[in-house]
């Protein structure tokens, strides 16, 4: 005998459970997409629109033009930038 009792099952219980699980999954997906938009895409879109509206296109960074220091390692001399 079942100590917790049992209820008669309805034939639509499985379908209702599936619909409920699908609805919750869709809500979670919408929440994840909204969070991704707020965190990443919004910032990327504003950066891209600022670059295209000002006519500035991101290119390679110029090389550092700082003074160099002589580095001696195991008797070999090399020039190394102070930026590193």
Curated annotation (Swiss-Prot):
It comes from Miscanthus streak virus (isolate 91). Its main location: host cell. It is a single-pass membrane protein. Keywords: Host membrane, Membrane, Transmembrane, Transmembrane helix, Transport, Viral movement protein. Interacts with the capsid protein (CP). Part of a MP-CP-viral DNA complex. It comes from the Viruses. The chain crosses the membrane at residues 15-35. It is found in: Host membrane. One of its GO terms (cellular component) is host cell membrane. GO terms for biological process: transport of virus in host, cell to cell. Involved in the viral transport within, and between cells. This is Putative movement protein.
């Amino acid at each position: 005998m079942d100590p917790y009792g049992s209820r008669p099952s309805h034939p639509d219980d499985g379908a209702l459970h599936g619909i409920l699980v699908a609805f919750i999954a869709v809500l979670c997906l919408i929440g994840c997409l909204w969070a991704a938009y707020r965190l990443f895409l919004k910032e990327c879109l504003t950066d891209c629109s600022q670059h295209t509206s000002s006519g500035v296109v991101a290119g390679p960074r110029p090389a550092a033009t700082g003074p160099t220091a002589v580095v001696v390692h195991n008797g070999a001399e090399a020039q190394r930038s102070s930026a590193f």
